[in-house]
A protein has these predicted regions:
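Extended, low-hydrophobicity segments enriched in charged/polar residues
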Residues: 1-100
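Residue-identity detector for threonine
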Residues: 5, 11-13, 38, 115, ...
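Generic serine detector
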Residues: 19-20, 33, 76, 90, ...
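Hydrophobic alpha-helical membrane-spanning segments
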Residues: 47-50, 63-76, 117-124, 141-146, ...
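Short helix/strand-capping turn motifs
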Residues: 75-131
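Alpha-helical oligomerization segments
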Residues: 122-187
Length: 187
């Protein structure tokens, strides 16, 4: 199978932009309590009616579709082991990268994968559908090119909820209405 890019999903759904797509995905797994009605229904239509082979973004985990690519890239930098830990524990375990790649060891939820010298950190936070890669800009640029990643550069001023916006009026859809529509099969 060929993975879809986020731009592919935007094109297939005709969702306005990456921020609207992120809000729809956040609402889908209930990280946001409301969403733009038309944008959300575009995503749902794609997932449940048009393309049943598409899985929405994984939450709380590094997406399986890129996990090994990221680990292979870290190996290409000369590392054989990484520190692995969840975001809610301070204990860090040194793990052989090959054991992660072969699934002998599985990453925890909300994982942190860090090189022993702290030059690279890959992290997925609680209830988030995106993965952060922290490093020096030249390493990040190589990551992007070799792993074929989509995204954007963040800094200390980029909020975690970068796509969040207040939605009002008829366009606002909340959880209770969404569940009611789900049970009535109006989607």
């Amino acid at each position: 199978y060929n993975p879809l890019t986020w731009q592919d999903v935007i094109t297939l759904t005709r969702i306005k932009d990456i921020s609207s797509l992120d809000r729809a995905l956040a609402f889908l797994h209930r990280a946001y309590s409301y969403v733009e009605r038309t944008e959300y229904y575009k995503l749902i239509r794609l997932l449940v009616k048009e393309r049943l082979d598409i899985l929405p973004a994984e939450v709380d985990n590094i997406p399986k579709i890129i996990e090994n690519k990221l680990l292979y890239f870290i190996k290409s930098l000369g590392y054989n082991e990484v520190l692995v830990y969840p975001n809610f524990l301070s204990y860090k375990e040194m793990v052989n990268i090959d054991k992660l790649i072969s699934n002998q060891i599985v990453l925890p939820c909300q994982p942190r994968v860090e090189t022993p010298d702290s030059k690279v950190l890959i992290a997925t936070d609680f209830d988030q559908r995106f993965t952060y890669i922290l490093s020096e800009k030249d390493i990040l640029q190589n990551f992007i090119e070799s792993v074929n990643l989509e995204g954007f550069f963040c800094n200390k001023k980029t909020p975690e909820s970068w796509s969040y916006k207040i939605i009002q009026g008829e366009e606002k859809l909340d959880w209770s209405e969404d569940m009611e529509n789900y049970y009535k099969n109006k989607i």
